[in-house]
Amino acid sequence: MLEANVYDNFNPNYYNISDFSMPNGKKEKRGLPIPKARCQVINYELWETGYLYTSSATLTVSVEVGDIVQILFPEVVPIEEALGKKKKLNLDMVYLVTDVDESNKATLKNYFWAMIESLDVPNAITKTTNFAIIDYLIDPNKNNLMSYGYFFNSSIFAGKATINRKAETSSAHDVAKRIFSKVQFQPTTTIQHAPSETDPRNLLFINFASRNWNRKRITTRVDIKQSVTMDTETIVERSAYNFAVVFVKNKATDDYTDPPKMYIAKNNGDVIDYSTYHGDGTDLPDVRTAKTLFYDRDDHGNPPELSTIKVEISPSTIVTRLIFNQNELLPLYVNDLVDIWYEGKLYSGYIADRVKTEFNDRLIFVESGDKPNVI
C-alpha cells in the first residue's frame, strides 16, 4: 500500500516571494510547507508523466480540489543531471486534485500540466529555441503553481523546433506536447530537499533529465506474457484536407482577381506547388480533399509562405503505441529510448509514460514520428 503527503495549494502568490532568510543572510523564495496530512493510497491508477491520461486514487484522508498530493513510492530513479553527475531520486509523483467524489476518490492532474494550464505562448517565443520555450513555461511569475527550477539535459533539448501557427499565440499545453513529442521526452515532477546542505527548504523541481545524459537506444522485445495492447496516437493533429486552392489578393484591385495557385500534400507529407508536379500520381493521396484559402499580401507585397499553406493541408502524424507490463529483469524508465520487437516487427521510439496500479506496473511506448523538425 502506498503513502502520500497532502499539501495545501502551492500558490505562487504566496511562495514566489523572496523573503526567506538563508543562513548567509541572502533572501530566497519561500520553501514549500510541511504536509498538512499523511495518508494511505488505495484503488489507484497513477501516471508518472500524465501527458495523455489523468490519474486517480482514493485517499484515507479528506482532500479538496486545489490540494497537492505527493505519492511516495519505495523506489529510486536514476538521473544524470549534468554530464558525469549522476544521482538517484526517490520516486514520487506530484499531482493537483481537480475533483473529489463522495468516496474520497480524487481525480489527479500531473503537476507540470496543471502548472502550465491556461498559459499561452507568443509566436515570438515559439520561433526561438526549445530551451527558451521551456524557460518561458517554467516561470512561477506566470504559472498557476509554484516551481523552483528544473533538472535540464541540454543535449536532449538542443536545437530549434519551428511551430507553424496562424494565430499570434499558442496554448502552452499544445506547444509543450509538440516539443516533447519531437525530442521524445516527457517531464516529471519531484519534491526534494534543497541542493545546499545549509538550505533548510523543501523545493519542487521539474525534471528534464534522463537516467543517462547521452541516451543510448535499448533493444528489447515484448510478448503476450506482458499483456501487450496496441493502438495508435496522433502526436501532431493537423488537417483533414490534402489539396489547397489559394487566392491571394491583388494589391491594385484590392480583390482576389488573380488566378489561384494549387498546392497538394504528397503521401510522404511534403507540400508542393501542384503546377510543378510531374509524377505519375502514385505518390499522391487516393482521394483529393480540397480546401479554398484566401490571403492578403504582407506589408512588403509578398504572398503567404509555403509553411503557412502547409499548416492547412498537412496530414496528421499518427504513430503506434504499445502498452505492456514492466519486465523486472530489464526494467525500463520513463524517457528511455527503446527499440522494441513485437510480433516480428521492430518499433523505434521511447517510453513516454508509466502507470502504476495496485495490480501491475505498465509502460507506454510511443513510436517516433520521424518527421522533419517542423512540428
UniProtKB/Swiss-Prot annotation:
Give one Pfam family, short name only.
Caud_bapl16_4th
Which InterPro entries does the record match to this protein? Caud_bapl16_1st, Caud_bapl16_2nd, Caud_bapl16_3rd, Caud_bapl16_4th, Gp16_dom1_2, Gp16_domD4
Q: Which UniProt keywords apply?
A: Viral baseplate protein, Viral genome ejection through host cell envelope, Viral long flexible tail ejection system, Viral penetration into host cytoplasm, Viral tail protein, Virion, Virus entry into host cell
**Where does the UniProt entry say this protein principally localizes?**
virion
Stored Gene3D superfamilies:
2.30.300.20, 3.30.1920.20, Baseplate protein Gp16, domain 2
Q: Report the GO terms under cellular component.
A: virus tail, baseplate
Q: What does this protein do?
A: Forms a dome thereby closing the central channel at the end of the baseplate. Changes its conformation upon activation by calcium allowing the channel to open at the bottom of the baseplate for DNA ejection.
Similarity field: Belongs to the skunalikevirus baseplate protein gp16 family.
> What is this protein called in UniProt?
Baseplate protein gp16
Organism (species): Lactococcus phage p2
